Amino acid sequence: MIKWLFKYGAVIFLFNTVLLAIESTKAIGDQVFLVLMAVFAIALLINPQQIKNVLFHKAFSFLLILNLLNVFYFLIFHSINDIEAIKYLLARGIQFSIISVAIFFNYEYYKTKFLDHLVYVIVFIVFVGLLFNADLFSGRYGGLIWNSNMLASFTSLAFAILFLNEKQKTRFEVFLLLLLFVISISTGSRGVLLAIALAFLFKYGFSKRNIFYSFLALSVYFLIVNIQLDTSINRFASQSLFNDRFLQYQYAYETIFKQPFFGFGLDKYAYIDPSVIPYSLRGYNISAHNGYLAILTQYGLIFGSIILFIIFRKTVQVSTWFKQSFETERAYLFIIISALFVSVYETMITGINEFHTILFWFGLAFLSYTKFTTDHEN
């Protein structure tokens, strides 16, 4: 049982975010998360020698350093009575442990099958959503998912994973690509356009084919913006990517400089100080909507800069190495790079139970482990 949990704990952890994203199953998702955290923590404690070999593995050293930074920050700026900070500290530590252990004990599965299974689960969610709500263009489409942006995250990543697969596409897979593309656009998420463009860039680079696709996309763009819909293209044309973000960036910036050096604490990720929000806007759900500002708000400029340095350094390492490798799944690198772009306008890479954030950390750890094992074999 424990061996199975070590191998597939990351799968449960990731797919549970789907339950959390569906209003009718959110309560179940909350319970699954708590049980997984508790059981995995016990499994770690009763297998100290095995876990030591994993957590101290050179490929996962960047995750260990981030965990140690969290512990160090907690000891300096928090007390044992800060329950929410303790929850974040433990959840982040177990999250990184789940990822590291899964890759170490089940590497071949995550290299050859996991991404396919991920696409299948998302496609299943899409099909079930269409059974209950097939009206794609009456507004921002959400299907089963309570938040249209979350559905866009699911479908655009599934589209990219399937699109970047080098295997010859079957007719059914071509149909799935078209379906995922249409669903992604119908969500009204402007970030979908960036994700799809990035996927084409990963696939074809700056080639003649991509130039042709760019002209084709531009033609479709001008066609759709003249139709009264609420798709990603229409919203991008009328609002731009950052239209409703600048004010929230301003509040995040003002919040950071209230405690610039050491931040507001581990329990204050995506935090905005209420005192900087105008009275007329209080009561609305306002957050940084920027992963980098969220980290600086949480940790301050000193610890936050160290964390961002570790993230970007590891990203550069695996990206540079990947250019020389034809074996590693390109989709993992896409997940990492797209998350860094998305973090400019969404609170990404800092939370615990967010789909793309989990995949981001998993992708970094997976490519780091792939790089280590390949270099070691050579």
Residue ranges and their predicted role:
Residues L5-Y8, V54-N67, G93, S100-V128, ...:
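Interfacial loop-to-transmembrane-helix boundary motif in multi-pass membrane proteins
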Residues M37-I42, L333-N378:
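Transmembrane alpha-helices of multi-pass inner-membrane enzymes
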Residues V32-M37, A59-F72, N81-F104:
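Aromatic-anchored transmembrane helix interface
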Residues M1-L5, Q49, L164-K169, W361-N378:
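A juxtamembrane structural motif centered on a specific transmembrane helix
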Residues S186-T187, Y204-S240, Y253-K258, L266:
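A membrane-periplasm/extracellular boundary helix in multi-pass inner-membrane enzymes
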Residues G142, R235-Q250, E254-K258, F262-Y299:
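Long extracytoplasmic/lumenal interhelical loops at the membrane interface
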Residues A102-F105, Y109-F137, W146-F206, R313:
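Alpha-helical transmembrane segments of multi-pass inner-membrane proteins
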Residues H57-S61, T170-F172, Y204, K208-F215, ...:
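Hydrophobic transmembrane alpha-helices and their immediate junctions
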